[in-house]
């Protein structure tokens, strides 16, 4: 009888990819995935630590799992093995056992390949096992190739860690220094997902455009080199990557938007603030003028490119003038979509120790103003698409039986009413008939 594995994933696309790999890793040991936590023999929370609220969600979920465990015990059933994985695990370590002593395993992002052994030890009644080692390439060398198809759009992790040490960010402490997978590993995985039906690949990394993987004859490939190499794969229609740092947007990568049709005209390029003073305090290693130059060069290479970004409001020391600089940058760039957050002090980062923290009510006010501007831009861009014909990759069923959903080259969701589910996995010309803030509606031509 097979055992059941339940994984709940928080945070970024990298965590989604890691969860897929953990699922593939445990399958040969008899663990089949389930979406029903109540029947699980192993429960894994793959956690995010980028903001305080995200970390507290982990502990709230662990509290709910404890109640589930107590119910199973009363019913005479065995308890599930509880695993906390991901960046909360890496950041908090033994503290997790202190706060939630019923957790069995704490494992960091670089040690997932040890999960079968750790789970086996718990089965043999060992408790409070922890593995937070940084082993860099060993993670990619020892995780299995894909077992379960990812679908029409697939994630492939090519780079991990970050050397930038932005003063608000925990990633260098939870994911370690930058390292890149070798080209052959990435290419083999890309061939595998395409042969399983993927038409689109999203390359992942904490700082993916810093990619510098070893290729044939020990040549070091940049991200632009890797994208050109992957673009040669037959039946692969679309390439994307995330997340990028402006300082690593080199000329070869920018020019590729004008020469490689498989590279989609959408780029998530976080800037975080429009104030030079705050950018310096954040240790972003560039100023707003540098960012504007990157944007201008991208638009010269690919005039229809659509941009996305991340913004943090209320970083320590941010004045009204600094915030106005952020609004000015937003209005000058004109984004298609964005993510924005209030600054959240993360333990162990330089920003958390500053004495000029911004009051919560001011952060909330600024976030509301910024989000109103960003939503207006997003709606304006979506509305500008009405009446146009766009190539849509249909990748999933909708909420209703006669509805399917796809993605434009610009990462917009498109809904159509069509009972022909054979369109899934295909790129089809769609006339856009309606726009809302978060999606488009269209008709098959």
Curated annotation (Swiss-Prot):
Residues 3-124 form the MTTase N-terminal domain. Its cofactor is [4Fe-4S] cluster. GO terms for cellular component: cytosol. It is found in: Cytoplasm. InterPro entries: Elp3/MiaA/NifB-like_rSAM (IPR006638), Methylthiotransferase (IPR005839), Methylthiotransferase_CS (IPR020612), Methylthiotransferase_N (IPR013848), Methylthiotransferase_N_sf (IPR038135), MiaB_methiolase (IPR006463), rSAM (IPR007197), rSAM_horseshoe (IPR023404). Residues 148-380 form the Radical SAM core domain. Its EC number is 2.8.4.3. [4Fe-4S] cluster 1 binds at residues 12, 48, 87. It holds the Pfam family Radical_SAM. Binds 2 [4Fe-4S] clusters. One cluster is coordinated with 3 cysteines and an exchangeable S-adenosyl-L-methionine. GO terms for molecular function: 4 iron, 4 sulfur cluster binding; metal ion binding; N6-isopentenyladenosine methylthiotransferase activity. Keywords: 4Fe-4S, Cytoplasm, Iron, Iron-sulfur, Metal-binding, S-adenosyl-L-methionine, Transferase, tRNA processing. Residues 383-445 form the TRAM domain. [4Fe-4S] cluster 2 binds at residues 162, 166, 169. It catalyses: N(6)-dimethylallyladenosine(37) in tRNA + (sulfur carrier)-SH + AH2 + 2 S-adenosyl-L-methionine = 2-methylsulfanyl-N(6)-dimethylallyladenosine(37) in tRNA + (sulfur carrier)-H + 5'-deoxyadenosine + L-methionine + A + S-adenosyl-L-homocysteine + 2 H(+). Monomer. Belongs to the methylthiotransferase family. MiaB subfamily. NCBIfam families: miaB-methiolase, MiaB/RimO family radical SAM methylthiotransferase. Catalyzes the methylthiolation of N6-(dimethylallyl)adenosine (i(6)A), leading to the formation of 2-methylthio-N6-(dimethylallyl)adenosine (ms(2)i(6)A) at position 37 in tRNAs that read codons beginning with uridine. This is tRNA-2-methylthio-N(6)-dimethylallyladenosine synthase.
């Amino acid at each position: 009888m097979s055992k059941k594995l339940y994984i709940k994933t928080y945070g970024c696309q990298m965590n989604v990819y890691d969860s897929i790999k953990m699922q593939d890793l445990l399958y040969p040991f008899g663990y089949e995935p389930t979406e029903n936590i109540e029947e699980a023999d192993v429960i894994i929370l793959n956690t995010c630590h980028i903001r305080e609220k995200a970390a507290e969600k982990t502990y709230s979920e662990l509290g709910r799992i404890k109640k589930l465990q107590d119910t199973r015990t009363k019913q005479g059933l065995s308890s599930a093995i509880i695993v906390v994985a991901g960046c909360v695990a890496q950041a908090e370590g033994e503290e997790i056992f202190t706060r939630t002593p019923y957790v069995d395993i704490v494992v960091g992002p670089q040690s997932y390949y040890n999960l079968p052994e750790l789970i086996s030890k718990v089965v043999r009644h060992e408790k409070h096992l922890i593995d937070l080692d940084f082993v860099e390439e060993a993670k990619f060398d020892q995780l299995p190739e894909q077992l379960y198809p990812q679908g029409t759009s697939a994630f492939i992790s090519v780079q991990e860690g970050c050397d930038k040490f932005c003063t608000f960010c925990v990633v260098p402490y939870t994911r370690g220094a930058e390292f890149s997978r070798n080209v052959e590993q990435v290419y083999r995985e890309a061939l595998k997902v395409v042969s399983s039906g993927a038409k689109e690949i999203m390359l992942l990394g904490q700082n993916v455009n810093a990619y510098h993987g070893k290729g044939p004859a020990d040549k070091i490939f940049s991200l632009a080199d890797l994208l050109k190499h992957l673009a040669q794969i037959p039946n692969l229609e679309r390439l994307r990557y995330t997340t990028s740092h402006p300082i690593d947007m080199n000329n070869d990568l920018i020019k590729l938007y004008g020469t490689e049709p498989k590279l989609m005209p959408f780029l998530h390029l976080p800037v975080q603030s429009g104030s030079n003073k705050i950018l310096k305090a954040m240790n972003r290693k560039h100023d707003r003028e540098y960012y504007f130059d990157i944007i201008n060069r991208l638009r010269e290479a690919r005039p229809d490119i659509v941009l996305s970004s991340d913004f943090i409001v209320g970083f320590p020391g941010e004045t009204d003038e600094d915030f106005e600089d952020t609004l000015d940058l937003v209005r000058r760039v004109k984004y298609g979509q964005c993510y924005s957050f209030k600054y959240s002090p993360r333990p162990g980062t330089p920003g958390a120790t500053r004495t000029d923290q911004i009051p919560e009510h001011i952060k909330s006010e600024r976030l509301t103003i910024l989000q109103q501007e960003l939503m207006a831009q997003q709606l304006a861009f979506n509305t500008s698409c009405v009446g146009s014909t766009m190539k849509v990759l249909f990748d999933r069923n909708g909420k209703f039986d006669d509805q399917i959903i796809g993605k434009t080259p610009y990462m917009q969701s498109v809904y159509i009413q069509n009972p022909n589910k054979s369109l899934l996995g295909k790129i089809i010309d769609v006339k856009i008939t309606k726009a809302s803030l978060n999606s488009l509606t269209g008709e098959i031509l």
